[in-house]
Amino acid sequence: PGLLPTPVETASALAAGARSGLLASDVVASLTRAGQGFALGALLGSALGFATGYLPRLSAAVTPLVSFLRPIPAIALVPLATAWFGIGETAKRLLIAYAVLLAVWLYVHDGVSRVPVSHLRAARTLG
């Protein structure tokens, strides 16, 4: 007993945070951080996915590294990110970006690599 707050204590703390405005500012900060990390991860994952999907040599070089990193959850990299970047916003955004990048890369790479060559030729011809 006493290790965790009771539901009543949790609800009263939530209400106090909402009244003081602290809850709203913390939610905005969290959503901003998540959005920035997602945007960075999606941008890098898309660029890498297009490049590796379109260029077989680059795919052969990058795919083993990404396949090695994919099973490592972002939460497992928290100690490493903290050691390298500290406990500030940079480490948090980069961990979110890491989690997003690998998923986006996988789907973009797969989609681009499956485009038939005839469709690429037609697109080049049509401008």
Q: Where are the regions that the model predicts?
A:
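Loop-to-transmembrane-helix entry motif
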Residues: 21, 30-38, 65, 69-75, ...
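Alpha-helical membrane-protein architecture signal
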Residues: 11, 20, 24, 28, ...
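Alpha-helical transmembrane segments of multipass membrane proteins
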Residues: 46-51, 79-80, 84, 104
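Transmembrane-helix boundary motif in ABC transporter permease subunits
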Residues: 36-66
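Transmembrane helix boundary and interhelical junction motifs in multipass membrane proteins
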Residues: 47, 73-78, 89-93
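Membrane-cytosol interface at the C-terminal ends of specific transmembrane alpha-helices
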Residues: 88-126
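Short helix-capping/hinge motifs at transmembrane helix termini and TM-loop junctions
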Residues: 1, 52-57, 81, 85-87, ...
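Periplasmic/extracellular loop-to-transmembrane helix junction in inner-membrane transport proteins
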Residues: 2-39
